[in-house]
Amino acid sequence: MRKRIYHSFKTQQHPLLLRRPLPPKLPKLPLVKKKVRIVQTGSAREPQEARRKFDTEESALVKIDQSVSQPQKPASVQNVCLDYEHDEPERVVNIFPHPHGVRRLHWKVPKSAAGSMFIPRCLSASSRVFRKTLSQIKRARKSLKSKQDEDLTKKPFSNTLVISEELSKPLPPSYSRLIASRFKHSGTKFRPAPKISHYIQELPLLKDVKETVLSPISSASSAIPEPEWSERPLPKTTIGKVIQLNTGSLPPAHSLPTPALPRKPPRQIMIENAVMTRKTETQKPVEITLRPTRRLDPDAHVLRGDGFKAVGATRSETILALTTLAIINCQIYGRNALNFKGFFLAQCPDLTSVAFQLVYLNLSYNDLHQFPGEVLYLQNLQVLKLRNNPIREIPSEIQQLKYLRKFTIAFNFITSLPAGLFCLNYLEELDVSYNEIENIPNEIQKLRSLEKLTVDGTNITAFPPGILKLNLVKLEFENTFTIPPFWLENSCNNPPRLTHICSLFIVKNNLHKILDYDPVVVQKYLISTSDCDWCHGPKFGEGFGIIRSCNIFGLSHVPIKFHVCSLSCYLEIRESSFVLEGFPSRRIALNMDWVKERKVSNVSFYL
């Protein structure tokens, strides 16, 4: 039993054989010649005289065959005019020569049509096969014509081509689709009207709508110029019923977005706004009011005077008045700085009123021939600038400025530095550049707070050995005679005097302590005024000088001139490679450059 059920189920799964449908039977076409009628298009209101004006060149020739069974022959298109107002044809195409027995077919092309157009020779095969179906469609179209006429009054005319009903045969659908596809809506879309309540407009009803011909909007690719609205004929309208249009139900208005303006820099925007405000402002006329003049009686008792007169002051008096005013303002407002730079003062103004409060004083670029004594009374002065003045000497009383930290006296005529200058314990910066200074005293070692020393443009040949005891941060000595070619010349020594040699011999051997009687003349020669830079003993006279260089203060080959007491000290320092300075003693390396090449016999001194 199970085998039978399985066999029956298996037989049901076989695929069914499908038979290919037979083609439909087409009716036999009659072998009868069909005449071609002249089809006229256009508006019904166009006169017949305008149609007769077409020349033979402005027609389309279509030849109809004798029988349907014969092969179709191609049509010959001579010329198609797209614009009646122009005399010259737009294009001429001759594909085949004109055969005999050709009938002319007049086909009117709208002015706005452009591109290729295909004129069918006969009805399509679908119209011959489905003739009954087409007739039913035609009846349905006729019943809908009345509804279409009503829709024309309601819908806006956009890209619409209305053809007259005088055509003998309807155009095939392929041709209508070809013409409709050639037009492109290039205009802007209709903007909806704003929503306004209770607004009614009365318009006349259009009756003969189908008699009017509406030309579609020309495409952007069409080269045919469109006639202006003033040249076009007005449509025929008849005043009939009145239609009331209520715009209360229209959609609300939408505001267009504001265009994005190009960005401008803020400076340009400010300038443009200023220009616009000047243009908008109206210039008000200046009102001139005439005041009545007072007439004086000549017989009246009136006192007349010249009033105040300007007194012509000299340049020096004017400058002195300005400096006095600056000092008064400094005193009133409690200021602690005065700047008289570039006043060309011949003398310093009185500074006693601000002697205790002044900290900064600048007297640069003036005409001070002497060091101003008024500055010495400024007890709390810390910065003093006397640059570019014809000062020739610095008084030793400068040591009264105990708190002076920065002293600048460059571009003057200073020849030497006083001993009182080296008593300023708080001095940090000293600028004596471009002066006539020839040497720097060894007492500079007392300025233990000195950090910056500037001696540019001076006549110095070397630095004293006391500079090795300082803690300088910056040392400047450009445009000087400290270069190595001048070292040998500046190391020449004069022969010592006999009195100096004898005094040195007596002191070193302590003979002045052994002798009970020292004459007064001998005691006068035994007094020493300086010490030896090598043995630190007494030195009589100038001694012997030698220049040795060392690398110090971040500079290389800084020349140091040592003054020794005797020939023995001279030979020792010449052969030594270091020197001890300071307390505790600091070992400073000396460069063995030019002294190794010289011999003792070449030393320029005499015994």
Swiss-Prot record:
PROSITE patterns: LRR. GO terms for biological process: intracellular signal transduction. The keyword Repeat applies. Keywords: Leucine-rich repeat, Repeat. Disulfide bonds: none annotated. InterPro entries: Leu-rich_rpt, Leu-rich_rpt_typical-subtyp, LRR_dom_sf, LRR_domain-containing, LRR_R13L4/SHOC2-like. It holds the Pfam family LRR_14. LRR repeats lie at residues 357-378, 380-401, 403-424, 426-447, 449-470, 471-497, 498-524. This is Leucine-rich repeat-containing protein 63. The gene is Lrrc63.
